[in-house]
């Protein structure tokens, strides 16, 4: 019961205080707005621009319907966010990319042995937040492969929770 969600990422050239957006001066940030929208930002790394994107925008698609180009609606949502919350970042658009999240219903990972086959391990989908957990997930998966188990409690990530739905 996974769903594919289209995500659009944007990089901007801030209109002022550009040094404040450099990775040495700014952390990654997450924004949970009162209207339910979520955004995240990342500082300028390697002079690629200040990155801004919505997190879980709810545009579910099929794998055959993925439009890899950003559009005016995508850009407008992010520009409006910048105008209200980080106006000095709301400069020239440098680049945009489209990627996908593969979401479970509860937006959590699957890290488990395949039912009825202890020789197969399912690791993911990560529902849009797996990358930052890569070292821990890698450690856990290597323990599952080598030791056929881990000391970490993986009950929250069991595939069985999704099979009940």
Predicted regions and their residues:
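C-terminal catalytic lobe of FAD-dependent flavoproteins
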Residues: 80-165
């Amino acid at each position: 019961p996974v769903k594919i969600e289209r995500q659009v990422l944007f990089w901007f050239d801030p209109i002022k205080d550009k040094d404040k957006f450099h990775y040495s001066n700014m952390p990654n940030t997450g924004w949970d707005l009162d209207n339910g929208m979520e955004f995240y930002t990342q500082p300028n790394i390697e002079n690629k621009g200040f990155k801004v994107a919505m997190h879980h925008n709810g545009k579910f698609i099929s794998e055959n319907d993925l439009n890899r180009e950003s559009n005016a609606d995508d850009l407008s949502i992010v520009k409006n966010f910048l105008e209200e919350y980080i106006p000095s970042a709301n400069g020239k658009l440098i680049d945009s990319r489209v990627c996908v999240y593969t979401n479970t219903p509860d937006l959590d990972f699957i890290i488990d042995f395949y039912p009825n086959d202890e020789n197969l391990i399912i690791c993911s989908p990560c529902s849009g937040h797996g990358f930052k957990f890569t070292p821990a997930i890698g450690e856990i998966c290597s323990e599952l492969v080598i030791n056929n188990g881990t000391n970490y409690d993986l009950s929250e990530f069991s595939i069985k929770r999704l099979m009940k739905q």
